[in-house]
């Protein structure tokens, strides 16, 4: 595990614990998702926030103006990150926090690779089947197009790969013929 992920994980876990204690897990989840999207969309703000020439107070004032509508506890958490010069970890903290929320709710992320975009019905069917296999209540599926598969699908959930693509079947057949 990289040091950045380890540091972000400690902060995310602490925030998650506070959220559980205050019954704000879902509120923080939504606000962190919005916050991460805002940071991604506004790189200039991120550069200002991470600029070492700004004082801690200037950074807090900037954050206060931008994040005025978020939960006060979450805003205080952001101030804590600024105080400790960890504001550059905010996006990673949001990711780790969301993973904790997903684990709590029995949700997993899945990447589905196919030759053509899958319909909502197909994605729902895949979600139902693989959620059961993974002992989860739901899968958040991201459909990716990969023309090299030739047909079928490849499903990646965490470290598990379920490959039912034509490409893999042909490679397996080739190995059997050569053996």
From Swiss-Prot:
GO terms for molecular function: proton-transporting ATP synthase activity, rotational mechanism. Pfam families: OSCP (PF00213). It comes from the Bacteria. SUPFAM superfamilies: N-terminal domain of the delta subunit of the F1F0-ATP synthase (SSF47928). It is a peripheral membrane protein. The keyword Transport applies. Keywords: ATP synthesis, Cell membrane, CF(1), Hydrogen ion transport, Ion transport, Membrane, Transport. One of its GO terms (cellular component) is plasma membrane. Its main location: membrane. It is found in: Cell membrane. F(1)F(0) ATP synthase produces ATP from ADP in the presence of a proton or sodium gradient. F-type ATPases consist of two structural domains, F(1) containing the extramembraneous catalytic core and F(0) containing the membrane proton channel, linked together by a central stalk and a peripheral stalk. During catalysis, ATP synthesis in the catalytic domain of F(1) is coupled via a rotary mechanism of the central stalk subunits to proton translocation. This protein is part of the stalk that links CF(0) to CF(1). It either transmits conformational changes from CF(0) to CF(1) or is implicated in proton conduction. F-type ATPases have 2 components, F(1) - the catalytic core - and F(0) - the membrane proton channel. F(1) has five subunits: alpha(3), beta(3), gamma(1), delta(1), epsilon(1). F(0) has three main subunits: a(1), b(2) and c(10-14). The alpha and beta chains form an alternating ring which encloses part of the gamma chain. F(1) is attached to F(0) by a central stalk formed by the gamma and epsilon chains, while a peripheral stalk is formed by the delta and b chains. PANTHER family: ATP SYNTHASE DELTA CHAIN. Belongs to the ATPase delta chain family. This is ATP synthase subunit delta. It comes from Listeria monocytogenes serotype 4b (strain CLIP80459). The lineage of its organism: Bacteria, Bacillati, Bacillota, Bacilli, Bacillales.
